[in-house]
Amino acid sequence: MATPPQRIVSLTPHLTELLFDIGAGDRVVATDDASDFPPEVAPLPRVANYRSINLEALLAQNPDLVVAWRSAQSRMLAPVEKLGIPVFYSEPTDFASLADEMRSLGRLLGTLQKADQQADAYLARLDALTQRYGKPKPVSVFYQLWYPPLTSVNDSTWPGRAIKLCGGRNIMADANTPYPQVGLEQVIKANPGLILAGSRDPAVLAHWRQWSMLDAVKQQRLVLINPDELHRFTPRALNAVEQLCEAIEQAGTIKSR
């Protein structure tokens, strides 16, 4: 692009947040229904949700760049690309690759110095967490993504990678799909020492208390993780990763006694 874009429409929460992180937040003119951080996004027009894009509302913003999540939104944006509007697609594959995306956005938007600073700080913290918590621990972990139906994650997902980074063993690590539906008997057989859920509501884990034979229940290791931090591809994810690592480390301390 000859000049850095000045009117950006962001269609996914993690990109909205990254734009502010790298110093381009003042150019965001519209976003999606789920973007709620930082607080400055509150008054912005909303032109999409996780299922669809309001093309008319998007075009009304006269954007010179649209940023989107490739795996979830590329098909929906075909009409936008046909109109010649540039689209930046995000698809971080692991924690380290997020820094590359920050730099790519910074290069595109003319804020590379700020993006480099943020990416370097993020990688330094990621390395510190890996050094502190990365040693494998004798802790089996079940991550409850949703209930009901009982749904978990394999190791290719953001939460799955976090469990691995923290040295835990995800009991659904090798599932054939990223977000497998799980039978209760599978969890009981695996007998995890820690059960996690991406939620702020303690009620989402209450159903486990009836299964008192589970190590996680015996040890009161039913832990909530902030979903807006862990499930979004941003530097804030490391706040949740650190919380997750602490939970695994504490469970490992009990296990090794």
Mark where each language-model region is.
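A ligand-binding cleft/hinge motif common to bilobed small-molecule-binding domains
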Residues: A72-K82, L194-L214
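Short, structured coil segments at secondary-structure junctions
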Residues: A24, P43, K82-G84, C166, ...
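Extracytoplasmic substrate-binding proteins
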Residues: R7, D64-L65, R75-T151, R169-D174, ...
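Short, low-complexity disordered leader/linker segments with a strong preference
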Residues: M1-P4
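A short, structured surface patch at a secondary-structure boundary
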Residues: R7-Q61, L65-S74, I171
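Short helices/loops that flank or line small-molecule/ion binding pockets
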Residues: L55-N62, L83, Q181-N191
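His/Asp/Glu-enriched short active-site or ligand-binding loop at hydrolase and phosphoryl-transfer sites
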Residues: D32, S156-Y179, S199, V223-L224
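Short secondary-structure boundary segments
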Residues: T12, R70, L145, A175, ...
